[in-house]
Amino acid sequence: KINILDAPGLFDYVGGVHEAITAADSAVIVASGKSGISVGAIKAYDLACELNKAKMLIISKVDSKSADFYKVLNQAKEILGPSVTPVIVPFKDGDSIGFINVLTKQAYITKDGVSVKASIPDSENDRINEMFNALCENIAETDEENKEDFKWYYENKDNYIKERLRYEYLDNNR
């Protein structure tokens, strides 16, 4: 069973955000792909850190012509710290927008209202590989038992990363 507590990110409602994050096991913080990281998002992130809650940042409105996913991602890294690492990233294919799963290195695009597998654009390959390596390193940093054993980690990383990400976000009752 999953319960979702929706709290507005406006600074005026910080009390409601505090109550929601306190009651929840984890926090999903939304930032606009058009306007970036808001003060409310920063406050929510800081509170989730203070309360030792798992955090997920979603960059919305990436389908807007004026959105800049990577600008907002870099802003998030500067403000919230280097552990901000994307798992899903958008890409443009003509007038369509697709998404790349950094973990599985699989791209999807919506055609006629249905998501279908697509090829990762050549222009995105290096960036996706860099993000995959950063994601692996950040996930490995959460594992006190194995983080120093890089040989073990690289031999087991395909399954380990998925399992560790699930554990950190869903199973780790802090």
Task: For every predicted segment, state its role.
Residues 1-3, 25-26, 54:
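Loop/turn-to-beta-strand initiation segments
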